[in-house]
Amino acid sequence: MDLTKLTAHELKDMLSNKEVKAEEITKAFLDRINLVDNKLGAYLYVSEEEAIKKAKEIDVKIEKNEELKALSGIPIGIKDNINVKGMQNTCASKILEGYTSPYDAHVTEKIKQEEGIILGKLNMDEFAMGSSTENSAFKLAKNPWDLERVPGGSSGGSAVAVAGSEATLSLGTDTGGSVRQPASFCGVVGLKPTYGRISRSGVVAFGSTLDQVGPMGKDVEDCALLTSVIAGLDKKDFTTVDKEVPDYKKSLTKDIKGKRIGIPKEFFGDGLDKNIRKSVEEAIKVLEANGAEVKPCSLPLMDYALSAYYIISSAEASSNLARFDGIRYGYRSKNFKDAQDIYLKSRSEGFGDEVKRRIMLGTYVLSAGYYDAYYKKALKVRKLIKDDFQRVFKDFDAIVSPTSPTTAFKVGEKKDDVMSMYLSDIYTVPISVAGVPAISLPCGMVDGLPVGLQIISDYFKEDVLFNLAYSYEQSVDFYKMRADF
């Protein structure tokens, strides 16, 4: 039996029944990483010794018949912008090359408390800016379904690790679609929770009013399991909400009778691949057959979401990334005349092109002459988009759409076409702007590549997402798909 192909809940059952040891599971994944990651590029750092040490500790507890915790013995990969004490945290950027984190992010603490085994740090677009993981300063990540194609981004490594059987679960971050789009491209399940449901403490900031940590897994049950562990109030993050986290396992039922689902016409317009449209429409029929009430709806302001997103996120990035100055830590230019020169050269040499592009855009829209015309206007548009979603959720429990207008595109195909790259997030960005939760799960294949179905719900209604996603997933076989790599 190939342990790397199993889900987290299957491995949990085997550990509980003493059919396998945690060390055996961990070594199977480490062997897999050593075998395939030179081609897949999911990991930027592997913590082999520490992972085996933790696994042995869990095996001792199992031998003593101690009760297992939620993630005991489950191998997990962490995106390289989420702090793990003693491991690198580079954000896939030259400017943080060699930086080792002195503390754990809140989500990392929660995983460690539940005895998850952290295998290492995962590849990403630099500072989470990108949709293909081609912006990593260190190496390319490849899609396990086709090595000539991208895995999506910015959490490309997180999706590749799960799809390529290099981790059972992974954590990514989602600012404008960075968990959902790679989940779609790689055929795994990925959740962007409600803004405030999961702590951002210890996560390197890109867009502070948009960033959210999101789990990825092989199926909906795995995704719900990891969400249950990391969700909840954190006093170190004032944006988290003191709201009880439901038992998401209770939502994992096929019964969705009476659930009202809206189909927004704006998500099915020009630019959507006809085969993806067909796959999503077939998925909607399955939900309807399972008892959901499906009706059309409209979100007329969605056309403005992408523009508002890039103004707001770039403005926040410009502010957040000002802290990387070549003085206290990270990359410092070797040739400089004075302090001003250190800042200029360290940042110019340390940041990649896409990061510099967004810093420049953000600085521009925050400048005195353009603040009202761009940034302030974008915030007003954001409020209207939120109102749009609230209006729809008065009549519907959820909205269904494609996750991405295309399947995974080829490496290099959009790297130099900025607008085309940005448009690959056209169905995920509105959800981020509004701050509502959404999940992506596989709903078909087009030319050998996975297609993602996006289900969106109202604030803090992740339980509704898991219910609908599980109902659909268990009615089809797409969740059993594994990349033959």
UniProtKB/Swiss-Prot annotation:
Superkingdom of the organism of origin: Bacteria
Protein's GO biological process: translation
Top-level EC class: ligase
EC assignment: 6.3.5.7
Classification via InterPro entries: Amidase (IPR000120), Amidase_CS (IPR020556), Amidase_dom (IPR023631), AS_sf (IPR036928), GatA (IPR004412)
Gene Ontology CC annotations of this record: glutamyl-tRNA(Gln) amidotransferase complex
Keyword set, alphabetical order: ATP-binding, Ligase, Nucleotide-binding, Protein biosynthesis
Keyword ATP-binding listed: yes
NCBIfam families: gatA (TIGR00132)
PANTHER family, alphabetized: GLUTAMYL-TRNA(GLN) AMIDOTRANSFERASE SUBUNIT A, TRANSAMIDASE
Function description: Allows the formation of correctly charged Gln-tRNA(Gln) through the transamidation of misacylated Glu-tRNA(Gln) in organisms which lack glutaminyl-tRNA synthetase. The reaction takes place in the presence of glutamine and ATP through an activated gamma-phospho-Glu-tRNA(Gln).
Family indicated by similarity: Belongs to the amidase family. GatA subfamily.
Record's subunit section: Heterotrimer of A, B and C subunits.
Protein name (record): Glutamyl-tRNA(Gln) amidotransferase subunit A
Taxonomic placement: Bacteria, Bacillati, Bacillota, Clostridia, Eubacteriales
Gene name as annotated: gatA
